[in-house]
């Protein structure tokens, strides 16, 4: 799996192409995690859909996609099947891995973060936890290192000083 976090007022220049698969099959693209709330949209089941209904639905979708793959042979269909399976695994594992409230105080202090603050520091800690759980690649974007003096506190002297304080409290 390939997971992406982004913090700051804007996303990275280049948008989703930064974690897209490029010339590789789409199974190699990254999954953007949000810094606040459910890490992935629709991670939680909607009201009225329990785990069994979801499992049955995903199993039916997989069977249909597999039949289509057998007929057409398009590798994008195989990538779609893998994406659904990854989504289901994330839905089961992500809530626990992404919950920093159970992290000990010393670790939170070392990283300079608080559960739910959506900071770059929290994303670094989440990245570590994901890697510990077997995620092979985590990409972190942090907007706010561009100091061209375009606004208050955005010149190199003040902007860089303030930014470094956030990185190394």
Residue ranges of predicted features:
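Ligand-binding pockets and gating/stacking loops
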Residues: 1-169
């Amino acid at each position: 799996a390939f997971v992406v976090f982004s913090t700051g007022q804007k996303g990275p220049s280049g948008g989703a192409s930064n974690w897209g698969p490029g010339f590789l099959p789409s199974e190699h693209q990254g999954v953007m995690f949000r810094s606040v709330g459910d890490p992935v949209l629709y991670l939680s089941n909607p009201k009225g859909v329990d785990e069994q209904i979801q499992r049955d639905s995903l199993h039916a979708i997989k069977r249909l996609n597999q039949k289509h793959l057998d007929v057409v042979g398009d590798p994008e269909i195989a990538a779609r099947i893998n994406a659904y399976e990854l989504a289901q695994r994330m839905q089961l594992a992500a809530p626990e891995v992404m919950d920093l409230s159970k992290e000990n105080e010393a670790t939170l202090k070392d990283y300079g973060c608080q559960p739910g603050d959506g900071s770059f520091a929290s994303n670094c800690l989440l990245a570590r936890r994901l890697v510990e759980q077997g995620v092979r690649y985590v990409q972190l974007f942090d907007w706010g290192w561009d100091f061209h003096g375009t606004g208050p506190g955005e010149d190199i002297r003040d902007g860089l000083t303030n930014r470094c304080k956030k990185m190394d409290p």
